Amino acid sequence: QTRNFFNVGQARKFMQTTLIAAQIKELLEQNKPSISTRQLYYILKRTIAGLKENTFENQNESDPIIEDVEVSIDALREELGLEPTPKGVFSGLITYKDLRTGDEINCRKMGTAGAAIPANVEPSVMEFKKSEAKFVLVVEKFAVWNVLNQMKFWDKHKCILLTGKGQGERSARRLVSRLNKELKLPVYVFCDFDPYGYYIYSVYKQGSINLAFFSEKSGCPDAKYIGLKHDDVKEFKIPKSNFIRLTEQDLKRLKEIKNYEWFKKKEWQDEIQKAIDFGYKIESDALVSKTIEFMGETYLPKVIKDKDWLD
């Protein structure tokens, strides 16, 4: 979208863009601590002198302009002193250096809590030092990550184990992308057998529809979906007591994602249609009903070894 300085209808947006750009410039030039987009909004919100009008009425006005600035200067907000609120954790065979503090973090020795994924995982802040990992395993749910981490799955199978605790936010997705592209590590994604599990995988792989610019830098196009899959139900004898009937909303969502461009491959069309016909969904947590160790000792090693995945 082009903004014209002489277009009165765009004057407010132009003013807001200038305010945000000036504040970012100050953050960088004065080497101030990074702030959140919410904090940026509060810094810039005020009543304009001589007018009964605020610079910003709510954060819904400032957020899209931040995206515009990112695209305009080809820089992520994390590089501009603006950081998201992370929620993911990871563990495994990697050491990285926090270039702000000089600390080295060994993710092999973070205990049952794991290492928090930093808000800013850009190379200017997070430098990969040592890794013997052979792949990255991304799991949808923290509960699944927690079991695998306690089993030290990452040690036995030489990997980095990561969860975004549901939908991966910016820093989790960007970290996975960096591990894949810079360390040349394959990425395997383990989610629930339901439309939202499929979608979470697609966001790690292709990025978010709403953030195309960020998706170019955070997508992981060769990520593999290793489960749960429809055919796993029979192969691994998942008991019917673990089935949850699909809701009308679930069925609607399955039909929607079946039409997404990145799910057009025959293997995905078949998988989604099988899910619709099956009529049930299954959570990845349900594998513990066989034994608590089943997913870490049997399911995951087998599907990875057999390359039983969807691309």
Go through each PLM region and give its residues.
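Nucleic-acid enzyme cleavage-core boundary/entry regions
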Residues: 1-186, 195-311
